[in-house]
């Protein structure tokens, strides 16, 4: 890694700004919403059988937009059954946004919310210290496994937190996405450190197979307009480049050869397509659903 390059996560406000821009320019949340509408009801169809309370755990839930859509599907499947929704999220800013969202949302009378301002590893340590293994009927980890130090250990721990008939839902970038192309080629030169791992759903599937876990995978088609990345001096384009490389102020700080190579490769068929004069990045995702033992 070039010594001048810093992880985007080291500048929280710039990370949040670039992440919001990513959501604005991509179909990330739309493709997740389509999955929740079309596939999630079947996935959760038996998690609450004979349960007086349904226990849900969100790990790295952000501001809760996707969480509340999934909660609505659980409510639709088991009307009136109390839902205990625990949230593990390290960002105070995101928790504040989540609480604001809950305050405005209708039809949450039977849902209790508990927020834990922790990383997933801090939550794991606390559970192990308390020696009281909580069991959950539904656990979801959406776009967060990049930020844990021990991915295999994290998978084993949260799988062990599943109640009988429980499901663990993981969403990550697909192994056939532009992200995978970018990370395989440039991961060694980008700020790969304690803050971020360059992993895809393909890596997770291999780990789950090595554990002997039962799981299914679903591919979600998603794209992102990155045209602004190629406009000189465009601030939004620079923020999107930061997000794509997980690097703070990439355009200014990256060595010229690395910057030029990545900008060139972002236009290549392995990363993007060109349509109506726009450069559209392959943001495909994979959903992995892990079964309880």
Swiss-Prot record:
Pfam family, one: Methyltransf_23
Catalysed reaction, written as an equation: histamine + S-adenosyl-L-methionine = N(tau)-methylhistamine + S-adenosyl-L-homocysteine + H(+)
Top-tier EC class: transferase
Residues that coordinate or bind substrate: 28, 283
Residues binding S-adenosyl-L-methionine, per UniProt: 60, 89, 94, 120, 142
Keyword Glycoprotein: no
Known role: Inactivates histamine by N-methylation. Plays an important role in degrading histamine and in regulating the airway response to histamine.
UniProt-recorded Gene Ontology molecular function terms: histamine N-methyltransferase activity
InterPro entries: HHMT-like, SAM-dependent_MTases_sf
UniProt protein name: Histamine N-methyltransferase A
Assigned GO CC terms: cytoplasm
Similarity-based family: Belongs to the class I-like SAM-binding methyltransferase superfamily. HNMT family.
SUPFAM superfamilies cross-referenced by the UniProt entry: S-adenosyl-L-methionine-dependent methyltransferases (SSF53335)
């Amino acid at each position: 890694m070039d010594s001048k390059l810093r992880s985007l996560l080291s500048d929280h406000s710039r990370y949040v700004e670039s992440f919001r821009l990513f959501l604005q320019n991509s179909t990330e949340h739309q493709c997740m919403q389509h999955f929740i509408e079309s596939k999630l009801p079947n996935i959760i169809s038996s998690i609450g059988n004979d349960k007086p309370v349904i226990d849900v755990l969100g790990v790295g839930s952000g501001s809760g937009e996707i969480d509340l859509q999934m909660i609505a599907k659980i409510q639709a499947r088991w009307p009136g059954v109390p839902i205990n929704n625990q949230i593990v999220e390290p960002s105070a800013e995101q928790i504040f946004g989540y609480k604001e969202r809950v305050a405005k949302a209708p039809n949450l009378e039977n849902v209790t919310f508990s927020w834990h301002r922790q990383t997933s590893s801090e939550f794991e340590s606390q559970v192990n210290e308390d020696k009281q293994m909580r069991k959950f009927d539904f656990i979801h980890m959406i776009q967060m496994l990049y930020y844990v130090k021990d991915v295999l250990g994290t998978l084993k721990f949260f799988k062990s937190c599943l109640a009988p008939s429980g499901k663990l839902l993981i969403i990550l970038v697909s192994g056939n996405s532009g992200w995978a192309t970018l990370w395989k080629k440039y991961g060694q030169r980008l700020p790969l450190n304690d803050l971020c791992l360059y992993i895809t759903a393909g890596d997770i599937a291999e780990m789950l197979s090595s554990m002997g876990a039962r799981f299914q995978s679903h591919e979600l088609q998603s794209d992102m307009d990155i045209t602004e990345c190629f406009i000189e001096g465009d601030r939004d384009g620079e923020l999107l480049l930061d997000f794509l490389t997980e690097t703070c102020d990439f355009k200014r700080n990256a060595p010229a050869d690395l910057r030029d190579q990545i900008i060139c490769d972002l236009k290549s068929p392995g990363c993007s397509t060109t349509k109506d004069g726009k450069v559209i990045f392959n943001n495909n995702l994979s959903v992995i659903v892990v079964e309880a033992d």
